[in-house]
From Swiss-Prot:
It comes from Oryza sativa subsp. japonica. The lineage of its organism: Eukaryota, Viridiplantae, Streptophyta, Embryophyta, Tracheophyta. The keyword DNA damage applies. GO terms for biological process: DNA recombination; double-strand break repair via nonhomologous end joining; telomere maintenance. Its EC number is 3.6.4.12. This is ATP-dependent DNA helicase 2 subunit KU80.
Length: 688
C-alpha cells in the first residue's frame, strides 16, 4: 500500500436498539466518504453490517457461525457507489454481536492485503447493549486477546464508538461489553469513546485522517549539560474549506486521465516599452517608506533576515497563573519523548510531574527549522497521562511579543453611576439565564465537547458538494437537525424555560436609542468622561473653555454672527455647547446671515463673502452629519435667486464647489453624486 493510502472497514450496528440513531450514522459515514473523495481519492472502504436478519460473509460460508453479519461492500476504492451503500441502511431484527463483526472485518483486511504494510483501520459503531455469544473455546476475554494479537501483527488499528443516550441504565451485560472493548484498548492500538447524543456522534468519527508530521525532532535543551530528546507535533490545526481551483472542461468526457488543470503564467512588461517582457532577473521588489519607494533585492533581503540556529531552549519556569489564557496564539503543539528512548521517556515524565506538582510552566525559545526567519517564544504546560499505555507529555502554546499585543482599556462597571448599573432583580434574571444555558451542569455530561463537535459549516459544505455533483441545479438544503443543535440553543431548553426568558425581557425595558452626533476633534479634546457629561452641559469646565478659546478665539458674544468675521463667529457658535440644540441654532443663524447678504447686495459686492460663509456652512454640515439641512437651504436659494436673474451668484456657487452634499460625502444625504454635480446646471424655467 502507498504511504498515504488508507484501507478502512466500517462496522455498523443496525440492530433494533440502534434504529433511532441510524440516520445520524448514515450522515457521518457519508461525510467521511465525501471528504475522502476530495482529499484521499485512492483510499479504500469496506462496509460490514451486523444485527441484520440475513447473514452474508465469507467466514459464515467457510466455517459456519458469524450469523446476522452482512458484508454490504467489499474493500474497494472510494467512489459514489460507496455513498449509496451507506444510504438507507437496513433496520435489523437481531441483537448485534460486535465481536463477530470485528472478526469479519479483520478477516476482510487480511484477505485483501495479507502481510502488506500500510494504514489499515476498522471503525466500530455500536451501543454494546446486548449479550455476546460464547466462543467455542475459552472465554470472551481470551477471544479478545486472540483478535488483538492478530491486529498487532498486521498493524491494524480500531476506533470504537459506543452510543448510549443519557438516561439508559447500565446492567451487567453493558459493563461486560465495555470491559471487553477497554481490553482491546490495552492490548492493541484501539480508541474507545462514549457518546450520548446524535450531535456528539457526528464528531466522534474521524472523517478525515491527517497524517501526523513532526515539526521538530531534536533536543529540548534545559541546560548545556541536560538535554532531552523530543519530537514535536501539531496538536490542533484549523480545518479549512477545500481550496477552490481553476478547472477546464475542454478535455473530452471520455478521457479518464485528463487533469482538467488550468495553468496560469504571468508576464511583466515595461511601461515605457509595452511590448518588452521584463525577465525575472531584472525585476525587484520595492517597499514604501514615506513618500518614496525603496528597492530591496532578494539577496539584500536575505542578508537582512534574522537566521537563528535550529533548537529548542528552556529559558526558565514561572507560575501557571502568571500566563493568561488569552495570550495563547496560533496552533497548539505537543512535545513527546523520542519513541523508543527510555531515558527521554523518564526525563519527560519526571520534569512534567515536577512542574505539575509545583504548579509551574516553562518558557521556551523555539526555532523549528534551520534557516527559519522567525523565533517562537512560548509556554510549555505539563500533560500528565491517566492511561497506562499513554506517556506523559507537554503542550506548547506560542506567546505574543510586545508588537503582537493589542491593548484596549475599558472602564470598570463599578465606576458607572447607579442609574447605569443593573438592579437586584435585573442581575438575578441575568444570572438565571447563564445557569439555564450552562453546557456543563452539575451531574451531567458536558454538552458540545470540542472533541465531539464537528464544524457545522464544513459538514454542510460536504453534503451540498455531494448533492451538487448529482443534481447540478439543486438548491441549498435546509440545515440538518443535528447541526442546528450546534448553531442554535437547544429548543427543548428554551421551551422549558420560557417563563424565565419572559421575565428577563420584562425586567429590561427597551427604549429607543436616538442617533448620536459625531464628536468633533475639539469636543474629543475636552471630553472628561461619561460621568461628567450632564455637568459639562450645564457648566463647562475651565479646561474646556480654555481649549475651545485656544482653538476658536471668540470675536464677540456667542450666538451672534457679525459682519467683521462671520466665518469665525459661526465656528465659535459651534464650539459653544449651551444647549442640546446648539448645532441647529448655529446653522440657522448662518443661513439667515447668508440670505441677508445676498438680498442686501448692491451690485453683487457681497457675493464673495456670502460664498465664503456658504463653504463654511457646507463643511460644518458634513462634520456634524446634517447634510439635508445644507441641501435644503441651497435648493431654496437657487429657487429664489434663479428667477431674479442672478446668474453670477449661481456660477460662483458652482466654481467654489459649494453645491449639494452627496452620499459619498455624508451617508445621511439623499443626493447622489451626479445630482450634486448637475444641480447648478439646471435650465431656467421658461417665461412663457
Amino acid at each position: 500500500m502507498a504511504r498515504n493510502k488508507e484501507a478502512l472497514v466500517l462496522l455498523l450496528d443496525v440492530g433494533p436498539s440502534m434504529h433511532g440513531v441510524l440516520q445520524e450514522v448514515e450522515n457521518i459515514c457519508s461525510t467521511l466518504v465525501h471528504k475522502k473523495l476530495v482529499y484521499n481519492r485512492s483510499d479504500e472502504i469496506g462496509v460490514v453490517l451486523f444485527g441484520t436478519k440475513e447473514t452474508s460473509n465469507e467466514l459464515a460460508k467457510e466455517l459456519g457461525g458469524y450469523k446476522h453479519v452482512v458484508v454490504a461492500r467489499d474493500i474497494k476504492v472510494v467512489d459514489e457507489e460507496t455513498t449509496n451503500a451507506l444510504q438507507n441502511l437496513p433496520r435489523g431484527t437481531s441483537p448485534g454481536d460486535f465481536l463477530d463483526a470485528i472478526v469479519v472485518g479483520l478477516d476482510m483486511l487480511i484477505r485483501k492485503f495479507g502481510n502488506i504494510k500500510g494504514k489499515q483501520r476498522m471503525c466500530l459503531v455500536t451501543d454494546a447493549q446486548h449479550p455476546l455469544r460464547d466462543p467455542p473455546q475459552g472465554t470472551k476475554k481470551d477471544q479478545v486477546d486472540t483478535i488483538a494479537d492478530q491486529m498487532k501483527r498486521h498493524e491494524i488499528k480500531m476506533d470504537c464508538i459506543i452510543f448510549r443516550e443519557s438516561g439508559v441504565r447500565h446492567n451487567a451485560v453493558m459493563d461486560e461489553n465495555d470491559q471487553l472493548l477497554y481490553h482491546f484498548r490495552e492490548r492493541s492500538v484501539t480508541k474507545v469513546v462514549h457518546v450520548d447524543s446524535p450531535t456528539s456522534l457526528l464528531g466522534a468519527l474521524r472523517t478525515r485522517n491527517v497524517l501526523p508530521v513532526t515539526v521538530f525532532r531534536g533536543d529540548l535543551e534545559v541546560s548545556s549539560s541536560f538535554k532531552i530528546k523530543v519530537w514535536v507535533y501539531k496538536k490542533t490545526s484549523e480545518e479549512k474549506f477545500p481550496t477552490l481551483k481553476k478547472y477546464s472542461d475542454k478535455a473530452p468526457a471520455s478521457d479518464k486521465f485528463a487533469s482538467h488543470e488550468v495553468k496560469v503564467d504571468y508576464e511583466y512588461k515595461s511601461v515605457l516599452e509595452p511590448d518588452t517582457v521584463v525577465p525575472p532577473d531584472q525585476r525587484i521588489k520595492g517597499y514604501l517608506y514615506g513618500p518614496q519607494v525603496v528597492p530591496i533585492s532578494s539577496a539584500e533581503w536575505e542578508a537582512v533576515k534574522f537566521k537563528p540556529e535550529k533548537g529548542v531552549k528552556l529559558l526558565g519556569f514561572t507560575d501557571r497563573s502568571s500566563i493568561s489564557r488569552h495570550y495563547f496564539m496560533k496552533d497548539v503543539f505537543s512535545f513527546v519523548p523520542e519513541p523508543g528512548n527510555t531515558k527521554a521517556v523518564a526525563a519527560v515524565s519526571a520534569l512534567a510531574r515536577a512542574m505539575s506538582e509545583m504548579n509551574k510552566v516553562a518558557i521556551l525559545r523555539c526555532v523549528w527549522r534551520q534557516g527559519q526567519g522567525n523565533v517562537a517564544l512560548g509556554v510549555l504546560t505539563p500533560n500528565i497521562s491517566s492511561a497506562k499505555n499513554v506517556l506523559d507529555s507537554f503542550y506548547f502554546n506560542i506567546l505574543p511579543f510586545a508588537e503582537d499585543i493589542r491593548e484596549f482599556q475599558f472602564r470598570s462597571f463599578s465606576s458607572l453611576p447607579s442609574s447605569s448599573q443593573p438592579t437586584k432583580e435585573q442581575q438575578e434574571a441575568a444570572d438565571n439565564l447563564v445557569k439555564m444555558l450552562d453546557l456543563a451542569p452539575p451531574g451531567r455530561e458536558e454538552i458540545l465537547k470540542p472533541d465531539f463537535t464537528p464544524n457545522p459549516m464544513l459538514e454542510r459544505f460536504y453534503r451540498y458538494l455531494d448533492l451538487k455533483s448529482k443534481q447540478p441545479d439543486a438548491n441549498v438544503p435546509p440545515l440538518d437537525k443535528c447541526l442546528k443543535k450546534i448553531t442554535e440553543p437547544d429548543p427543548d431548553v428554551i421551551d422549558y424555560q420560557a417563563p424565565l426568558i419572559k421575565k428577563l425581557g420584562n425586567v429590561f425595558e427597551l427604549k429607543e436609542n436616538p442617533k448620536k452626533k459625531k464628536a468633533r476633534t475639539q469636543d474629543r479634546l475636552t471630553y472628561t468622561g461619561a460621568d461628567d457629561q450632564a455637568k459639562l452641559l450645564e457648566e463647562p469646565s475651565a479646561e474646556k473653555v480654555g481649549v475651545s478659546e485656544a482653538l476658536y478665539p471668540p470675536k464677540k458674544k456667542a450666538g451672534e454672527i457679525g459682519d467683521h468675521n462671520p466665518v469665525q463667529d459661526f465656528e465659535a457658535m459651534l464650539t459653544q455647547r449651551s444647549s442640546s440644540t446648539w448645532v441647529q441654532t448655529a446653522i440657522e443663524e448662518m443661513q439667515k446671515y447668508i440670505t441677508a447678504l445676498i438680498q442686501d447686495s448692491c451690485d453683487r459686492d457681497n457675493h464673495q463673502k456670502a460664498l465664503e460663509c456658504l463653504v463654511a456652512l457646507r463643511k460644518a454640515c458634513i462634520i456634524e452629519q446634517e447634510p439635508n439641512e445644507y441641501n435644503g437651504f441651497v435648493t431654496k436659494l437657487c429657487q429664489k435667486f434663479r428667477p431674479a436673474g442672478d446668474k453670477i451668484f449661481l456660477q460662483l456657487l458652482s466654481s467654489k464647489k459649494a453645491s449639494l452634499i452627496s452620499k459619498e460625502e455624508a451617508p445621511d444625504s439623499d443626493v447622489t453624486e451626479e445630482m450634486a454635480r448637475n444641480f447648478c446646471l439646471k435650465p431656467e424655467p421658461s417665461s412663457q
